[in-house]
Amino acid sequence: MYRFQCDYTEGAHPAIMQRMVETNMEQTDGYGLDPYCDSARQKIKDLCECQDADVHFLVGGTQTNTTVISAALRPYQGAVAAVSGHINVHETGAIEATGHKVLPLPSGDGKISAVQVDEMCHAHFTDGSQEHMVQPGMVYISHPTENGTLYTKKELMDLYEVCKKYDMLLFLDGARLGYGLMAETNDIALTDLAKYTDVFYIGGTKVGALFGEAVVITNEALKKDFRYMIKQNGGMLAKGRLLGVQFDTLFTDDLYFKISAHADQLAMKLKKAFQKKGYGLRYDSYTNQQFPILPDSHIEKLKEKYVFEFWEKVSDAESAVRFCTSWATKPEVVEELIRDIEAC
């Protein structure tokens, strides 16, 4: 059996494991105050062309989202997100557990628009009973989205502009950011994220690291005392250098971008194979996540050799499923899967 159900079925890229072993017996300061975290921070700042950014390393995505959102919002504020957004459907109420409501907006493809946000905020701030309701205080988006779709630079800029209009923060979840940045249709760069968000993070857990997410803060107000929030939310790793070593390695010789491109290229081969067979696609994704609509009988046949994720029923006889490639996916296995798709 070969697993395509997610992009974190393996451990870490061999270069990271090698560097972890090489540095294992070194003595360093803890809590992210070591030379490896310093080096990784500087590399990220250079790539973002933003020397004033603050960079912090946390362990996982949900922990990162709860820490950022709880640091950014007042007690009476909530986070605006797509109804399918990770914080709304896949984090077990973690945001709500901090006392902040998720304010969902409808979305067919995983994205939300500046127009939607503007309409929601206008309705709130012109309501005579506004102080009786949760105030929108932040917009949360992800790139790629849960559905593998991508924001354009124009869409990002428009969202940032409407956030400034209503004095809100824009937070971009980058758990799969590498796969978004390297997608053939993507026009957003790290430099754009530094300009047109208040805070974003660069995912490591799903892009070659054993664990870890790198939070990049450009908003001055959010920078203050952020390490206190990390500690309070259980995110300050005593052996913080384990995060620094990993991100320092990922951003040496463009490794992060190379392994992300590898996953996207293999995903595009799968996408073309599904289309050639005549299968529809639930979402038009150019990232490492693909969502073909298959006859249920074909799904059962493919499940004999591969593990992939059920997404939703489309008809009585068809379902959408998700296939994920990753930095570790073997090209020869993708070729074998393509042959099996053709044989269905």
Regions found by a protein language model. Give the residues of each.
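Conserved C-terminal alpha-helix-loop-beta "cap" of PLP-dependent enzymes
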Residues: 74-78, 268-342
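Catalytic PLP-binding core of fold-type I/II PLP enzymes
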Residues: 151-183
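Conserved N-terminal alpha-helix of the aminotransferase class I/II PLP-enzyme fold
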Residues: 13-61, 83-88, 94
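Active-site C-terminal subdomain of aminotransferase-like
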Residues: 108, 135-137, 142, 150, ...
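Conserved PLP-anchoring active-site segment centered on the Schiff-base-forming lysine
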Residues: 71-89, 118
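Hydrophobic beta-strand scaffold residues
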Residues: 102-103, 170-172, 281
